[in-house]
């Protein structure tokens, strides 16, 4: 899994705001080349099948802060999207539409195939397991 370079710069210059922006999760096959240098959504290598549509589906970001003995941790998690039908995907991209909106790349480690419902299960929304954590 990768946090994209555009996430870091977007947080610093205000172009990515988890509290107000709209985010999407797109699925990709093993033909996609996604990593921390990914800057935006791409149709190259995107998955298909079932009721999955190009560009993916909207996901809701939840921002929280927890106090620790060393200060505080702000963390962000996203809703767990699902699609019906047969879909095979190797990973996903969470992004804000437009240029330089890539947030993070999820690598499933191997192709995952569903025959009924394909769900990207996000981790628990806690300071120790949320998808993105700023310490």
Features from the language model and the residues they span:
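Small cysteine-rich, disulfide-bonded extracellular modules of the LU/uPAR three-finger superfamily
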Residues: 1-90, 97-135
């Amino acid at each position: 899994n990768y946090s994209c370079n555009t996430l870091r710069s977007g947080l610093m210059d205000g172009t990515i705001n988890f509290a107000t922006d709209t985010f999407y999760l797109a699925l990709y096959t093993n033909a996609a080349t996604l990593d921390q240098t990914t800057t935006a959504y791409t149709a190259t290598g995107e998955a298909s099948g079932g009721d999955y549509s190009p560009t993916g589906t909207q996901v809701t970001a939840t921002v929280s802060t927890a106090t620790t003995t060393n200060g505080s941790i702000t963390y962000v998690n996203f809703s767990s999207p699902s699609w019906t039908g047969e879909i095979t995907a190797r990973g996903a991209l969470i992004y804000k539409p437009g240029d330089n909106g890539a947030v993070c790349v999820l690598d499933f480690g191997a192709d995952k195939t569903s025959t009924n419902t394909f769900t990207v299960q996000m981790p628990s929304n806690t300071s120790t397991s949320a998808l993105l954590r700023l310490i």
